[in-house]
Amino acid sequence: MTAQLIDGKAIAQTIRSTLKQKVAARIEAGKRAPGLAVILVGLDAASKIYVGSKRRACEEVGFESRSFDLDINTSEADLLALIDKCNQDPSIDGILVQLPLPEHIDDSKVIERIRPDKDVDGFHPYNVGRLAQRIPVLRPCTPLGIMTLIKSTGVDTYGLDATIVGASNIVGRPMTLELLLAGCTTTTCHRFTKNLEQKVRQADLLVVAVGKPGFILGEWIKPGAIVIDVGINRLENGSLVGDVEFDAASQHAGFITPVPGGVGPMTIACLLENTLYAAETYHDVN
């Protein structure tokens, strides 16, 4: 068996093309373009690349992109003040603060300062709580993108045994909630999990997000499983690999995401979807 590739890059481009059409229709109807504020603190190389991708994506679909590049020594108080300013700006529908932040700034305090109706990353406790209560509005971007990738396979998720490896607030925990919503029986694995191999082997659907290259052996994959590899790791030779042994896993899985070109493009596409959703649901003047 050789797995079918789930082409996140192509699916994300389709989403972006649809968004571009919707934005053009908004403007033709006399409405403004959605606005996204992107805040970067410091000069972390990986974050700069990722933020740059988000800004270019905004411009591609016709959004207004507002960029705030702050010095790494920016105080927490100054960052919170900037968020307050963006919260009050009616031309801004979404606020994104690129994580991780410098150690002297409290991530949780920053996330909670963003108004829930402008929290297009979907990290605010209000939005996570809505997802937990099965009434989601703005949903965490990476899990939302993963759900779109899973749907593209045509596989019915109801009743699937799903295993999530990694329990971060950004991916693992909200991913568990999304898969529960999708009718899966879910197992979430973390640093204290025993018998990880056994839990992976039983998974009809596997999502891995730990940031360790080749952490999941290909031979563990259940025949025909859907494998979603969220990890993106740069090796010493400069190549990018995921958290799953791709070549070996491809011999067992039914569907698998590549790295790069799988989950990453979907995260940005869903950020744009959330921003348009916020504009239409919360901020349009009727």
UniProtKB/Swiss-Prot annotation:
Keywords: Amino-acid biosynthesis, Histidine biosynthesis, Hydrolase, Methionine biosynthesis, Multifunctional enzyme, NADP, One-carbon metabolism, Oxidoreductase, Purine biosynthesis. It comes from the Bacteria. Signal peptide: none annotated. Pathway: One-carbon metabolism; tetrahydrofolate interconversion. NADP(+) binds at G166, A167, S168, I232. GO terms for biological process: L-histidine biosynthetic process; methionine biosynthetic process; purine nucleotide biosynthetic process; tetrahydrofolate interconversion. It catalyses: (6R)-5,10-methylene-5,6,7,8-tetrahydrofolate + NADP(+) = (6R)-5,10-methenyltetrahydrofolate + NADPH; (6R)-5,10-methenyltetrahydrofolate + H2O = (6R)-10-formyltetrahydrofolate + H(+). The keyword Membrane does not apply. Catalyzes the oxidation of 5,10-methylenetetrahydrofolate to 5,10-methenyltetrahydrofolate and then the hydrolysis of 5,10-methenyltetrahydrofolate to 10-formyltetrahydrofolate. Belongs to the tetrahydrofolate dehydrogenase/cyclohydrolase family. Homodimer. PANTHER family: C-1-TETRAHYDROFOLATE SYNTHASE, CYTOPLASMIC, C-1-TETRAHYDROFOLATE SYNTHASE, CYTOPLASMIC-RELATED. This is Bifunctional protein FolD. It comes from Shewanella denitrificans (strain OS217 / ATCC BAA-1090 / DSM 15013). The gene is folD.
